[in-house]
Design a protein with these regions (language model features):
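A short glycine-rich, aromatic-capped structural motif
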Residues: 1-69, 74-94, 176-177
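Residue-level detector of short, conserved catalytic/binding motifs and their immediate flanks
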Residues: 41, 48, 76, 121, ...
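Short non-domain terminal segments
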Residues: 1, 25, 46, 58, ...
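Functional-site microenvironments in short loops/helix caps that host divalent-cation chemistry
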Residues: 10, 18, 72, 83-216, ...
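Short loop segments at secondary-structure junctions
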Residues: 7, 201-203, 234-237
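Short, structured beta-strand segments at or near domain termini in extracellular proteins/domains
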Residues: 225-237
Length: 237
């Protein structure tokens, strides 16, 4: 895993403001107005570890005994995994390697609680992901897109093995493109309830959607063939 130094990151997003125009709304009437509001905030980042690559099919299958994807190449990222699958994998990997479990996970209620003082594997936060992706770079990407990423314009409509493109300054591969990556955070709980954040773009994504600051969202039990994940680990004193 790669050591990520402390620092600060500025996050920005455009959120939907939904307001009822009339309390006498009936189905079929134009009762909702949506306005995009820019939200900007800064987050301090403590040092942590982040995986050099997204979790591969080989590693995922070895740890879980399950095969969710339809690919057969061991070095390709695991796909067709939900946020809940990713959280469960983190705990299983922690146990396999002798670390404490970072998550308390209830399969029945699907509730997840973090044990912040443990050294187990976890998903990166939204802020950690962007900070690590940019790696001191200033632009939307840390390099030319064809040099660093598999996206719709060069992927031939398929997933590729990890590590084939150039890494960023901190030695992280495929932070942009190939697969979207699950992050820990809720997107906007008030509006979207339990939707979780995905980052980075994918092999199927247009160029404009593949960047360090691009943020999307999805349900925690959703899975598809261009979403995977990357693991992190806290540095516990």
């Amino acid at each position: 895993m790669v050591y990520i130094p402390e620092g600060e990151v500025c996050l920005r997003d455009f959120r939907d403001e939904q307001k009822w125009i009339s309390s006498n709304y009936k189905f079929g009437m134009p009762g909702v107005r949506k306005n995009l509001k820019e939200v900007i905030w800064n987050v301090e980042i403590k040092p942590f570890y982040l995986a050099k690559y997204t979790v591969t099919e080989e590693l995922y299958t070895t740890i879980t005994g399950k095969k969710f994807s339809t690919t057969t190449e061991a070095r390709k990222p695991i796909i067709n995994v939900s946020w809940l699958d990713a959280v469960n994998f983190c705990n299983l990997l922690s146990v396999a390697l002798g670390y404490d479990q970072f998550y308390d996970f209830d399969n029945g209620s699907k509730s997840v609680i973090c044990n912040y003082n443990t050294n187990g594997f976890r998903l990166p936060t939204d802020a950690e992901w962007q900070y690590a992706c940019k790696a001191n770079s200033k632009g939307y990407r840390y390099g030319g897109i064809d040099e660093i990423a598999w996206y719709k314009g060069n992927s031939n409509e398929r997933l590729h093995e990890v590590g084939e493109k150039k890494p960023n300054e901190w030695g992280l591969y495929d932070m942009i493109g190939n697969t979207w990556e699950w992050c820990w955070d809720l997107y906007d709980e008030e509006v979207f309830s339990n939707y979780r954040i995905i980052r980075g773009g994918s092999w199927a994504e247009e160029e404009r959607g593949c960047g360090a600051t691009c943020r999307r969202k999805s349900m925690p039990d959703f899975y598809i063939d261009d979403i995977g994940f990357r693991i992190a680990r806290s540095i516990v004193q």
